[in-house]
Swiss-Prot record:
This is Ribosome-binding factor A. The gene is rbfA. It comes from the Bacteria. One of several proteins that assist in the late maturation steps of the functional core of the 30S ribosomal subunit. Associates with free 30S ribosomal subunits (but not with 30S subunits that are part of 70S ribosomes or polysomes). Required for efficient processing of 16S rRNA. May interact with the 5'-terminal helix region of 16S rRNA. One of its GO terms (cellular component) is cytosol. InterPro entries: KH_dom-like_a/b, RbfA, RbfA_dom_sf, Ribosome-bd_factorA_CS. It is found in: Cytoplasm. Keywords: Cytoplasm, Ribosome biogenesis. One of its GO terms (biological process) is maturation of SSU-rRNA. Belongs to the RbfA family.
Length: 117
């Protein structure tokens, strides 16, 4: 990513958190956090990584709600960020948090087994 794409991604992350948290009223969208935004070098595509609190069903419902509101989110983003063209938004789950939790669980299990022996 170029320096400009990185700056645009950080600004989008901040604005998306505000838009999703305050402007969207869809009951399908649960408690979520925008963890990262990666913008392509030409500023045409933005991958938005989200973390959702809840089970797999809640995550899927949240993704459906975000897909339905994608046009509204993009227009709000266009009003807040000065770009010639607002990037196309793609929402994806941030698997790194689940991966980190899994590693932490494994370490705790290893430590518990070590103390028992």
């Amino acid at each position: 990513m170029t320096m400009r794409a990185t700056r645009v991604g950080e600004q989008m992350k901040k604005e998306l958190g505000d838009i999703i948290g305050r402007k969207l009223k869809d009951p399908r969208i649960g408690f979520l956090t925008v963890t990262d935004v990666r913008v392509s070098g030409d500023l045409q595509i933005a991958k938005v990584y989200i973390s959702v609190l809840g089970d797999e069903k809640k995550r899927e419902e949240t993704l459906k709600g975000l897909a339905k509101a994608k046009g509204f989110i993009r227009s709000e983003l266009g009003n807040r960020i000065r770009l010639r063209k607002t990037p196309e938004i793609h929402f994806e789950f941030d698997e790194s948090i689940d991966y980190g939790n899994r590693i932490e669980t494994l370490i705790h299990e290893l430590n518990a087994n070590k103390e028992e022996s």
